[in-house]
Amino acid sequence: MQNTVLRLRTSTCHVTRQRLLFFVSGVALSALVLQKDTAEAQETNASTVLQPIVVQGTAATKGARVEQRGYVATQSASATKITTAISETPQSVSVVTRGAMTDRAVQTVADSLLYSANVNGQRYGNDPRSDYFSIRGFGADLYLDGLRVPQIANQTGGYAGFRVEPYFLNRVEVLRGPSSALFGQTNVGGVVNMISKDPSETAGGEVYTRFGSYKQKEAGFDVTGPLGADSDLTYRLEGIIRDSETMNDFGKNDRFAISPTVRWSPDEDTSLTVYGAYMKDDAGQVPSLIPAVGSIYPNRLGLTIPRSFSDGDPSLAIYDKETAYTGYRLEHAFNDDLVLRQNFRYSYLDVNYQNLFGNGLSANQRTLSRLVYNAQPTLNAVALDTNLEYRFDSGPISHTLLGGIDVQWQNLVNRTGSRSGPTLDLFNPGYGIGVQPAALTTHLDQTQRQVGFYLQDQMELGGLRLTVGGRQDYVSNDSDSTALASGLTTRYRQDDSAFTGRVGAAYVFDNGLVPYALYSTSFSPVLTLTPTPLKPTKGELKEVGVKFAPQGDDFSLTLSGFEATQQNVVNRVASVYYQTDEVRVRGIELEANATLWDSLNLTAAASWQDPVVTESQTPAQIGKMPYTVPKQQQSLFVSYDLPMPDSWNGKLTLGAGVRRIGRTAGDTANSFFVPGYTLVDAFARYEHDRYSFQLNGYNLGDKTYVAGCNTPTQCYYGQGLTVVGTVSVKW
């Protein structure tokens, strides 16, 4: 139902950035002061390094939070909300450990996923505003410690997207396939669940400096330990500051981020973790939108658009973003069989986005038309999840029952305006022309509320593992769109509800072989930057596979075949979102991780899939490939600790990786295709006592390639050769 009223509604929830920053800074200052007392109270050794976390809390979840140097993880909490052996989980799960992230010197969450099976980690190149990635050809959902990170249009990325700092993370887990039966809002492709570093009972710390390509200068720190001798309080304080340019002229990749965490553990059955984070980003001119002609295909003039080309202007190159979140995680075990958990987080985002970008190419194939765009989004979000875990036996069957309720609330206020801008010569650009910002013309106020009730039973009978779960969701979406010139408001109201379920079975053989099968459904309401609400996405997954973990912590392999179908798939062209009726993806995936001889780590992945539009209101799109979805991907990353003479008193580690992304469709009509590409990365690290010296290189061949396209005039170059050096000191 739609009506028009003369009223402008503002956000119903507002917490000032100054108060959030005051909160974060206060906790940080307290932790730093108490660190001095802790250091004096403990006997230290100069050769001691930052120890792996001694996890406090209940056994139900601590296994998935332990820091790991190797590449093989054995447990995950993403698939079931309870720490479960990955090999016994009837679903494809990957874990990128802290050790793997350190070896690759990842600077974004998307970077950490570049070697995971069937994850396209840079579908639009390297964008300092947000992380863009997809799983199995569908937009992925982003979670932090089991709670959903606010997202626009059910996709990571976008100019109003959160970008969590990877230095604050212990691991990144990839759950392929929907998890709506537990988490609620998830796409059929899967979930990326980021696990934060926890405070440690052992005092330690790290400081580092980093220099690299594009004039990058960065420094960071991570300190942790108990808050006083014999204290039941522990803390962790992390922070980074970066000043950097980007591949594109007038682009920036500046960041300041800080994250304090305090944990109270009065006994072995109870823990309360209170945390916060504040991040401020300055991206300047956003990555360039370039035409396919002159980048993928030859220009009739015989000219190629350089990678450093900017479609903007330094007089209007503004992208400033502030994000913050704070919350708590509570666990209490009443006894060995009954555990209560509650997870709460409040999130805030504010963006000032004023840019000039390309949106068309003239017939002469060198004159670029441009759009002046102005957006001022503010997002407030609250998430609360409460559940009970109960373990019991019914005859020969062991049960782990999980039931709970979660509540999610999001309010997005976005003021936008746009107009045609001055044209630009692709091959002889003139900059510094004094472009004025576009006037704001529209005020959008959207509020989304969701309540979900879920129940899951994990059953064991001998080697059989059976997981059955279901969830009922109720969602409302209120949207007011006001024309600022007239004051007229158009109001939309949308209510939805859905039941989603999951049934999975696996059989654990003594030799480590685990065949499994899974059926799961998904449901996800959509919050957008446009006035008219989009339909919720719905999907289903059928998956069979086999896992092999013969040596416990040393080796793991997963081979899976799947068919994923999703209705109302959300797509994006520039800042406009629209939906495709139905997309189906059938595929095969293989991923292996190994830690051998305590010196060799490797991760290998390969995927082959057939993505196709099966239903559309535009008949010509049926049978076509969705854009930015590769049919195949392969990758391999290996690191090796070289034997060193005892006299060196150090360790030398060398590593290298190769990743291949197959060709993708460049638009919905499949009128052209983006060629596939192969990239090589490498690193070397020397560790001596408390000191570490590391050098990383990405795209060592300096290959020029296009990462993806939405239309013939909206393509994105991939990152060129990038070199980064890091020096760190641990204690």
Range-by-range predicted roles:
Residues 282-295, 411-414, 502-548, 553-580, ...:
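Surface-exposed extracellular loop regions of Gram-negative outer-membrane beta-barrel proteins
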Residues 51-202, 544:
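Acidic, small-polar-rich N-terminal luminal/periplasmic segments of exported/outer-membrane proteins
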Residues 2, 659-667, 685-731:
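C-terminal beta-signal and adjacent terminal beta-strands/loops
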Residues 263-267, 379, 398-402, 406-408, ...:
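Structural signature of Gram-negative outer-membrane beta-barrels, strongest in the C-terminal barrel
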Residues 331-333, 337-345, 349-355, 536-598, ...:
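Membrane-embedded beta-barrel scaffold of Gram-negative outer-membrane proteins
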Residues 151, 167-170, 181-258, 266-270, ...:
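Outer-membrane beta-barrel translocator/receptor signature
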Residues 563, 580-668, 701, 726-730:
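Gram-negative outer-membrane beta-barrel transporters
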Residues 242-246, 258-333, 348-379, 422-450:
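Acidic/polar loop-and-plug regions of large Gram-negative outer-membrane beta-barrel proteins
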